[in-house]
Amino acid sequence: MAANPALPPQNIEAEECILGGILLDPEAMGRIIDLLVVDAFYVKAHRLIYEAMLSLHGQSQPTDLMSVSSWLQDHHHFEAIGGMVKLTQLLDRTISAVNIDRFAALIMDKYLRRQLIAAGHDIVDLGYETSKELETIFDESEQKIFRLTQSRPQAGLVPLSETLVNTFIELDKLHEKLSSPGVETQFYDLDAMTGGLQRADLIILAGRPSMGKTAFGLGIAANIAKNQNLPVAIFSLEMSKEQLALRLVASESLIDSNRLRTGHFSQAEFEPLTAAMGTLSSLPIYIDDTASISVTQMRSQVRRLQSEQKGPLGMVLIDYLQLMEGGSDNRVQELSKITRSLKGLAREINAPVIALSQLSRAVESRTNKRPMMSDLRESGCISGDSLISLASTGKRVSIKDLLDEKDFEIWAINEQTMKLESAKVSRVFCTGKKLVYILKTRLGRTIKATANHRFLTIDGWKRLDELSLKEHIALPRKLESSSLQLMSDEELGLLGHLIGDGCTLPRHAIQYTSNKIELAEKVVELAKAVFGDQINPRISQERQWYQVYIPASYRLTHNKKNPITKWLENLDVFGLRSYEKFVPNQVFEQPQRAIAIFLRHLWSTDGCVKLIVEKSSRPVAYYATSSEKLAKDVQSLLLKLGINARLSKISQNGKGRDNYHVTITGQADLQIFVDQIGAVDKDKQASVEEIKTHIAQHQANTNRDVIPKQIWKTYVLPQIQIKGITTRDLQMRLGNAYCGTALYKHNLSRERAAKIATITQSPEIEKLSQSDIYWDSIVSITETGVEEVFDLTVPGPHNFVANDIIVHNSIEQDADLIMMIYRDEYYNPDTPDPGVAELLIVKHRNGPTGVVKLLFKPEFTQFLNLQRSNDY
């Protein structure tokens, strides 16, 4: 295939006309926002300018010259686009925005052609991948083209009358082949309980599949359009316009929807069918069936519809919530952002917005299938591999292995005292498969959780999708250890050496390697102390290395193994390569002193303890390994000693496996290390002594173990107002030079917080200064995919420690009205109430909750009142 030297399809002049037109006439933005995407612009500067315009339009701000230039400056793009010269150039080259629609279509045409070229290149490359099955190649190629066709601009809202014409043609072809304070729904009991749908309310209508969510939503929409002649906008992300129209026709004509769909209806039914078409055609119902639509696009279309109708809207229906796009690169915050935006939309247009929502499978797992509020909340969950520390033994168990267990104790924070306490778990359960995100802190602690799982901040519990980077969350400062030592000091020492520098692979001699003779001799000593005459260790010098071979003193057979092999097998750590190694659970079950012994010997292998002498000396201790799991285990063991170490990944730039460093800095943590862990060999012992001397001669400078600066706004400032203490007086008592409000921009050390607690006589600040919490900042939140997730129930504190992070297990729901549909006959065909549907009002911000019973006719996909109208 000959290379095409020409530039990719583009039209720079049209791009300039579009941008200049918007700068001249900001109202023109509404005409192209649904047609034109950012990436359609060929020139990068044009993409940045259009992105600014989209952002401003989404915030209901003008897209004039000053607003756009200000946005670009605030986001550090002003110089990149060419500054004010570029913007004024766009204005100078544009006369008006009259033809902006045609230019937008032209730009999208060029963009899609570029995308087609790129897809073509990808498909050509796939053709050369002979290692893949041909069917797989075809499938991937089709997907690329399909995704491209889906990126075309959608038609937007289409009048129902136009859709019904096509629907009637299709039906004919098939046949030939064979007053209230709110908006009244005409469902009388519902209107009586709610006073009608309140304008500016966000309403969630939830249920499991096949309960009739769409049918009920369409019924409300049709009733509002028919009885009050108010425009209704329907955004269907799941079903096409034609499918919705067919449902409305079936409900209005009372003809079986299945027979309509297949064309099997009689000649006599043409009259009610035609009448239904006429009735529905006159209704002000507008449908957009774009498969994936953002809130920004939706808002733009609703605004336009309201402007065209020159009056209020009856309602907006969205089917359904989980299919909406949030327009954010970080999916963590999207769902929360969508619901907030929908509530904002309801307030802006002063009309009820009904969002249909799919309930989780948790409903199906219960004997009573009636949905509950918690099913919609989808209480926060964590991944099955999350490790829970058992308070009774110190053992760590993955939450999935605790499934159905109860009455065991874990660690939880008592929010009254801010101290860690043991708390009993009443239930462990699986909540199905959900999208999870991995949260990582500055110390390298990580946990995978759903977007609605909550974490403790200085301002209280926040959902993961409400957290921001650099925000501090609560970690335990220390986890207590067991008081019963089940492994000898010699076993712990030998295990530390073998995990660090031992080779314990099958069909290989048990071997330990060191460049220090004293460590080789120490391993021999420890091995003899543990296994006695069952082994016959020897040291062999090979170049600069000392190899310690530890064979059995007897002949090995199929059923007779080296005693060290059996020992390591019992600990589940035999046969591991360096990057697979980890610390066995038995070590976590030891007392603090025993854990320190294990770490002392492990540190003698790939650990480092030294005083770095530069312009200013600084002590450091770190352990390096190619096993991420081992690094995490070491970090968790250090936590049992009260050391909050940092875990970091050290890339080898393709020259080998990445390394993981567990690093200890800070005077308080290093003091614990040198006092309790220390060193085995003489070189490290000398370094330990140097660090001890350095610590004794230098004052600690806390910049990591701090209380977040939000403490000023949340606790300190309200307290000094209560006590009548001025800012100047507070700073004087703290021994500071007066600096006004600049002081409030800084985090607080625990010591300074304690001083403030004394000055202000605040028990809350005092508890924070003496808490069992280490506040660590968030460095990343990343989507990882869908996986099985679990949760705990902890009566009392309602939180627990998982992966050495304090987490909660409940969330909030912010809708004004929440309704859930339940049909008993779906689960129980022999129900005494066939055809009866229950509408459960589980949350009502401005009125009562309760149950409304309706009649459901599945053949017509229709809901009806069970009782006659009553005045309310």
Curated annotation (Swiss-Prot):
UniProt keyword annotation of DNA-binding present: yes
Domain SF4 helicase as annotated: residue spans: 176-443, 606-870
GO cellular component, one term: primosome complex
Maturation and modification: This protein undergoes a protein self splicing that involves a post-translational excision of the intervening region (intein) followed by peptide ligation. The intein-coding region can be inserted into another gene and undergo protein splicing.
Residues given in the record as ATP binding sites: 207-214
Family in the record: Belongs to the helicase family. DnaB subfamily.
Subunit organization: Homohexamer.
Record-given protein name: Replicative DNA helicase DnaB
Organism field: Synechocystis sp. (strain ATCC 27184 / PCC 6803 / Kazusa)
Protein's gene: dnaB
